[in-house]
C-alpha cells in the first residue's frame, strides 16, 4: 500500500508522535456553543461569548497545567479568540509547548432506513477549511463518528459509512498539513455487557483501519481516539483492571503498530473512573506498541467548572482543581497514578451525547 507521502509527511509524523508523548495528553475544549452552554448553565453562568472565552482562558492560562498537555482541541470560535490582555489563545498554547487542534466535523445526521443510527457530515468544504485552520496555527484535527450498541446495532451500513467518512476526512487533513484524530465513538448507552462492547469495538476499529488503508492514509501521521471497552451505562460495573484487559486486547487485535498513540475519550465516565481506567491500562505488562493517553473534555473540566462557578474570586481554586486533574492524568499515562488527586466521582454520562 502506498501511504500519503506529500509535502507534509515528515511534519505529520513528528506532530503525531509529539502529541503521543508519554506523560502528556489532549485537553478536548472543542464543545460547540450549545454544549458549552449546558455546562455554563449547570453553574448558573450565561452562555455568551465573553463567558465562554473566560472559561477557556481559565484552562489555557492555568500555571503549570500545560506541561501535562501536548494538544488542545479547539472549536472554531476559540481558534481566533484572545486572552483578556489581547494575546491569541493559539500563541498561549504554542508558547506552552502545546499543539493547537481543531474540530472539523459538522455534526451527525440520521442514516435513512436505520433505527436512528447516524453518520457525520462536513466533507464538502473540508480541504478549504483545513488549509485555513493550518494557516491560523492548527496542527491537528478531530472528527467524531458516533455508533450505538442495540439489539441490531451498529448495522453494517452504519459501520461502513462511518469508517469511510473517517478515512476521507483523514486523507484530506493530511493533504493540508493536519494530523487527523480518528474518533469512532461507540456510545456507552444501554444494558450490554463488556463482552458485547469488546466485540462491537473490534468490529468497528477493524473497519476503520481497512478504510484508512484503502484511502492511503499515512498511519504514522494519525492518532486514534476510541472509547474504552466498558459495560453499558445500565449494566453492572467492573473493575479498572478488567476494563484495561479488555480494552488493550481490543487494540492489540485491531490497531496497527504504525499508529503512534491512542488517546481515549472519557465517554461520560466520572473524572476518577476515567483516570483509574487509563492508569490500569498503562500498568498492564503486555504488548503495547502505541502510547496510551487521554483526550478528555468533561473528565478534565468537571471539578474545575464547579470550583469556578463563573466567579473571579474562585479563579485560584478552579485552577488548582484543573492542575490536579492534568497531573493525575499525566501520571495515569505512565501507570503511576495513586488516586490521591481531588476528583469528581459523579458520573458525567449524558444519554446520546452530542458535542
Curated annotation (Swiss-Prot):
Its EC number is 4.1.2.13. This is Fructose-bisphosphate aldolase, cytoplasmic isozyme. It is found in: Cytoplasm. Disulfide bonds: none annotated. InterPro entries: Aldolase_I_AS, Aldolase_TIM, FBA_I. PROSITE patterns: ALDOLASE_CLASS_I (PS00158). It catalyses: beta-D-fructose 1,6-bisphosphate = D-glyceraldehyde 3-phosphate + dihydroxyacetone phosphate. It comes from Zea mays (Maize). Pfam families: Glycolytic. The active site is at residues 183, 225. GO terms for biological process: fructose 1,6-bisphosphate metabolic process; glycolytic process; response to anoxia; sucrose biosynthetic process. It is an enzyme of class 4 (lyase). It comes from the Eukaryota. NCBIfam families: FrucBisAld_I. Pathway: Carbohydrate degradation; glycolysis; D-glyceraldehyde 3-phosphate and glycerone phosphate from D-glucose: step 4/4. GO terms for molecular function: fructose-bisphosphate aldolase activity. Keywords: Cytoplasm, Glycolysis, Lyase, Schiff base. Substrate binds at residues 52, 142. Belongs to the class I fructose-bisphosphate aldolase family. One of its GO terms (cellular component) is cytosol. The record marks 355 as: Necessary for preference for fructose 1,6-bisphosphate over fructose 1-phosphate.
